[in-house]
UniProtKB/Swiss-Prot annotation:
It is a multi-pass membrane protein. InterPro entries: UppP. It is found in: Cell membrane. The chain crosses the membrane at residues 1-21, 38-58, 85-105, 118-138, 191-211, 223-243, 251-271. This is Undecaprenyl-diphosphatase 2. It holds the Pfam family BacA. GO terms for cellular component: plasma membrane. GO terms for molecular function: undecaprenyl-diphosphatase activity.
Length: 278
């Protein structure tokens, strides 16, 4: 991998990771555009780790609050500790549902789903649900203290859909969290914190390739480092921008983007093209 390719991939991954527009779809589209062969699934997960590092650092206070509250609840049954304890449980439940269903659906998601028509269709589905949640759904004002087990199950099921290329993980979790009645601030926080165990869980698949030198051999030491740093930097910017954007604007603008990108993907690329990230 060249330095330029490492920078481009890092920028695309970082910017799109947490926006409701599917980072995997954009990585695949980038490969279509530049006729570039992706190093493998291990490299994709390696970049996800950079994105998650940005989340951990940005939400470090929230994360610490949840962890401390979770363990403190065993000794101190205060209301604040109870809220944080239950929030941790809701993260665990949603993650568990996603993990189990993700494994069951693993064999279903093959190279045939990494084609322009499938990705375009998935982007249209994402855009459609973004419009539905904005135009036909009345926002409620439930916060973390109002969450229930039902909310975590709904969001966990929604997050599972992200195994399909073109379905955004952040989009799926935001939509289902809002649908369950959580306010925007709580939905965004829940979505970001949920990404940590999900992506760290899949990152074990890349550790072997990294330790035995496979990733370094496939990508190159310097491009690997550069892609990681660039991904981290643009993920950090993406987090800041998305949180600020959602305070001022609506998810429907992402829907318009998904529709435009779907049209471009469907009509610009050969429908027989496939890219397997495995």
């Amino acid at each position: 991998m060249s330095i330029i390719e490492a920078i481009i991939i890092g920028i695309v991954q970082g910017i799109t990771e947490f926006l409701p527009i599917s980072s995997t779809a954009h990585i695949v589209i980038t490969q279509f555009l530049f006729d570039y062969t992706f190093p493998g699934f291990g490299f994709e997960i390696f970049l996800h780790i950079a994105s998650i590092l940005a989340v951990i650092l940005y939400f470090r206070k929230d994360l610490l609050q949840v962890i401390v509250g979770f363990f403190s609840y065993f000794k101190d049954k205060s209301e604040e500790n109870r809220i944080q304890f239950m929030f941790a449980i809701y993260i665990i439940v949603a993650t568990g549902i996603t993990g189990v269903l993700g494994l069951l659906l693993e064999d279903l998601v093959g190279a045939q789903m990494k084609t322009p028509p499938f990705i375009a269709g998935a982007l249209i589905i994402t855009g459609t649900f973004l419009i539905i949640i904005e135009r036909f759904f009345v926002y409620k004002d439930r916060t973390v203290k109002d969450m229930t087990l039902k909310d975590s199950i709904i969001v966990g099921l929604g997050q599972t859909l992200a195994v399909f290329p073109g379905i955004s993980r952040s989009g799926a979790t935001l939509i289902t969290a809002l649908f369950s009645g959580l306010n925007k601030e709580t939905a965004v926080r829940y979505s970001f914190l949920l990404s940590i165990p999900v992506i760290l869980g899949t990152s074990v698949l890349a550790i072997g390739d990294l330790l035995d030198g496979t990733l370094v051999e496939q990508v190159g030491g310097l491009p690997l480092i550069i892609s990681f740093i660039v991904t981290f930097f643009f993920s950090w910017l993406g987090i800041i921008w998305l949180i600020d954007f959602l305070k001022r604007s609506k998810l429907i603008y992402f829907a318009f983007y998904c529709f435009a990108l779907a049209i471009f993907v469907f009509f610009y690329f050969d429908h027989n093209m496939t890219i397997d990230l495995e």
